[in-house]
UniProtKB/Swiss-Prot annotation:
Domain of life: Bacteria
HAMAP family linked to this entry: CinA_B (MF_00226_B)
UniProt similarity note: Belongs to the CinA family.
Organism this protein belongs to: Shewanella sp. (strain W3-18-1)
Protein name per the record: CinA-like protein
Coiled coil: none
SMART domains linked: MoCF_biosynth
SUPFAM superfamilies: CinA-like, Molybdenum cofactor biosynthesis proteins
Length: 424
């Protein structure tokens, strides 16, 4: 099966928004052992949409079309598909009724413009969208099925998981015997990871891929076929062994997700005091439902005054060592933990740049501390020649990893190949 994707929208084509839908769709398909062969982005011009539908339908077996199903004048996907096939738009009575029901349930009057969303190409097969007003549909043109989906990410994901994937599996008799293991790493570059993994002899049916999503690099181990699936745990173990401390999570998208899963329902509590990371550590945890069960508070103590008055940092410590120092960040962590007697507290203070560095403490210098009931762990890392955003995200990741290792009763401070560390 040859799968392609057509992304629509002037804002996507012009770069006004980042096309996260395409990235999510490609990643999701890959997890099911299906690779996208081509992706095309086209603006909101009727003639361009017609042309790309006609041209790509000669080459693909199935095409996921994303966007252009709304009620406004620049939503042209249904009209373009009808013209590409040489047929009329007709009202889908079933979807019109669903639209009217949707607005009634939400105590709203349906605008006349929304009736456009019930107008589908004459040969279209309706694809249900229980979470929105944009009607999905599919049409056969030349050799391809074109499967039309909403541009709203939540609606797209719902439709792909519940409608698109089952459809292509049935239509093309795809073998569902695919398994995937993901290993999340930090502190080593993609080439360094590959140098360690490539010498491994992989059994037939198992392949390895890499995805950089800083501050992490994700290792994907695919197993296709029953024999390969049986061997997947063993291969995963070998990969983890050669990568050592670089592996920080399995089947998690971020270290924040790993920390959340370990603290949730654990009875343990966490507080956070952040300077250079500016609430990033706390924010990433709050993204997950249930984080209130373990997260006591997150404090952004950016100024020296706030470090003193909120966290109880000794003014003499700041005078003698500066805000970016091991003594200061240790006192920040202790102070954050003491406020509500949390089990753990993380603290960061650093120079994210692009300015503010000195010869002794250049841009990219970050002090990180973990306070526990039994003591404090701390380190000052070096992240030179990184952007401000990357300095902050790498610092948050190292802080998470310190906590993760403490939760696993492992050495809290470890060496990362691509992250330097000052001696205390």
């Amino acid at each position: 099966m040859k799968l392609e994707m057509i992304c629509t929208g002037e804002e996507v084509l012009s770069g006004q928004i980042v096309d996260t839908n395409a990235a999510w769709f490609a990643s999701t398909m890959m997890e099911h052992g299906i690779e996208i062969q081509r992706r095309v982005t086209v603006g909101d011009r009727l003639e361009d949409l017609i042309a790309v539908f006609q041209e790509r339908s000669l080459h693909a077996d199935v095409i996921l079309v994303n966007g252009g199903l709304g009620p406004t004048s620049d939503d042209m996907s249904a009209e373009a598909m009808a013209k590409a096939k040489g047929e009329s738009l007709v009202e889908n009575i079933e979807w019109r009724q669903q639209l009217e029901d949707w607005f009634t349930r939400n105590n709203r009057e349906m605008p006349v413009s929304n009736l456009k969303q019930a107008m589908l190409p004459e040969s279209a097969v309706m694809v249900d969208n229980p979470v929105g007003t944009a009607c999905g549909f599919r049409v056969k043109l030349n050799r391809a099925w074109l499967f039309f989906t909403p541009g709203v990410p939540f609606e797209l994901k719902h439709m792909v998981k519940e409608q698109f994937i089952p459809f292509i599996r049935d239509e093309f008799n795809l073998d569902a015997k695919v398994a995937l293991k993901k290993l999340l790493t930090i502190g080593q570059g993609e080439s360094a990871l590959a140098d360690k993994i490539e010498p491994l002899e992989l059994p037939e049916g198992i392949t390895i891929g890499y995805r950089s999503s800083m501050p992490h690099i994700e290792i994907k181990i695919f197993a296709r076929g029953e024999k390969a699936i049986v061997l997947l745990p063993r291969v995963t173990g070998h990969v983890k062994m050669v990568l050592g401390t670089a592996v920080v999570a399995e089947d998690k998208a971020t270290l924040a997700e790993e920390i959340h899963s370990r603290l949730l329902n654990s009875g343990l509590t966490l507080s956070v005091a952040e300077s250079c990371t500016g609430g990033m550590i706390t924010s990433q945890l709050v993204d997950f439902a249930g984080s209130s069960s373990y997260l006591h508070h997150g404090l952004v103590t950016y100024s020296n005054e706030s470090k003193v008055r909120v966290l109880g940092v000794n003014p003499a410590t700041l005078d003698d060592h500066g805000a970016v120092s091991i003594p200061t960040v240790e006192e920040m962590a202790k102070g954050a933990r003491a406020i509500l007697d949390s089990d753990f507290a993380l603290a960061t203070s650093g120079i994210a740049g692009p300015d503010g560095g000195t010869e002794d403490k250049p841009v990219g210098t970050v002090a990180i501390a973990l306070a526990t009931r039994n003591g404090v762990y701390s380190q000052m890392i070096k992240l030179p020649r990184r952007s401000r955003d990357l300095v902050r995200s790498l610092s948050a990741a190292v802080a998470y990893d310190m906590l993760r290792r403490e939760l696993l009763a492992e050495a809290v401070i470890v060496d990362y190949q691509s992250i330097g560390r000052f001696s205390k």
